[in-house]
Curated annotation (Swiss-Prot):
Record organism: Shigella flexneri serotype 5b (strain 8401)
Name of the protein in question: Sulfate transporter CysZ
Recorded GO CC terms: plasma membrane
Signal peptide segment: none
Domain of life of the source: Bacteria
NCBIfam families: PRK04949.1 (NF003433)
GO molecular function: high-affinity sulfate:proton symporter activity
Family (UniProt): Belongs to the CysZ family.
Localization (cell): Cell inner membrane
Membrane-spanning ranges: 31-51, 75-95, 151-171, 222-242
Main subcellular location of this protein, as a coarse class: membrane
Keyword Metal-binding: no
UniProt KW keywords: Amino-acid biosynthesis, Cell inner membrane, Cell membrane, Cysteine biosynthesis, Membrane, Sulfate transport, Transmembrane, Transmembrane helix, Transport
Chain's gene name: cysZ
Cited function: High affinity, high specificity proton-dependent sulfate transporter, which mediates sulfate uptake. Provides the sulfur source for the cysteine synthesis pathway.
Length: 253
């Protein structure tokens, strides 16, 4: 099926909503199963464990609040919960994406072919196995780019006052941008677009990508919904690629 998508770019909210629609398209659902299973097993188990630990972690986190901010404790407590969910959710979604990266790339490729009518390269299990080293190298590039920035932000959490007020906001913005990079990279990588060039392309539509990443980050924190977010985000990011980036960067048409 050739896509009814237009070349006019939409908001990141639109593409996130499209992800929920596209994930259930006939012919696409079978490529959703493996990423979905990885996400359900890892995120489901991780968040179950997290919720058993919150009553220990949150008081520890709040102990860093200085005396002069104690009067704001009733506001800072929910902010602390959100902070833990943000950091924890992003960490485990990163692990899930590492494990499911070859299948996410295949999902993006098949959806792009369906949306555009283009013919992708040979796929299948042997095609996936052949591409695994390249895909893992790409995931490593993302991790190396992300890690030092994440460490700086995590250090901010241990600064009294800043860690309970400014750091959660900065982490949310950072995770929104990183999740946009994570999911938009699958269609870019399918066309062998270098990692640096991909980031430059995303910056040309930074607001759209931040909107998409912010919604993905929020849904990653919500129990049950976060079990389905990986294939949904891959589909939404692929729709964005088709509308906004494919004409300039596509390797196969």
């Amino acid at each position: 099926m050739v896509s009814s998508f237009t070349s006019a770019p939409r908001s990141g909210f639109y593409y996130f909503a499209q992800g929920w629609k596209l994930v259930s398209q006939p012919g696409i659902r079978r490529f959703v199963i493996l990423p979905l299973l990885v996400n359900i097993l890892l995120m489901g188990g991780a968040f179950w464990w997290l919720f058993t630990q919150l009553d220990v972690w949150i008081p520890t986190f709040m102990s860093y609040v200085p005396d002069w901010l104690q009067w704001l404790s009733y506001l800072l407590w929910p902010l602390a919960v959100i902070s833990v969910l943000l950091v924890f959710g992003y960490f485990f979604s990163t692990i899930a994406n590492w494990i499911a990266a070859p299948f996410n790339g295949l999902l993006a490729e098949q959806l792009e072919a369906r949306l555009t009518g283009a013919t992708p390269p040979d796929t299948g299990i042997f095609g996936i196995m052949k591409d695994v080293p390249r895909i893992m190298k790409r995931e490593w590039q993302k991790f190396v780019w992300y890690l030092p920035r994440a460490i700086v932000l995590l250090i901010l959490y241990f600064i009294p006052g800043i860690g309970q007020t400014v750091a959660p906001v900065l982490w949310f913005l950072f995770s929104a941008w990183m999740l946009a990079i994570q999911y938009c990279d699958y269609p870019f990588d399918n066309h062998k677009v270098p990692f640096k060039e991909m980031r430059t392309a995303l910056r040309t539509r930074k607001i759209t990508n931040m909107q998409f990443g912010a919604l993905t980050s929020l849904f990653t924190m919500i129990p049950l919904l976060n079990l389905f977010i990986m294939p949904v985000a891959v589909c939404g990011a692929t729709a964005m690629w088709v509308d906004c980036y494919r004409d300039k960067h596509a390797m196969w048409r």
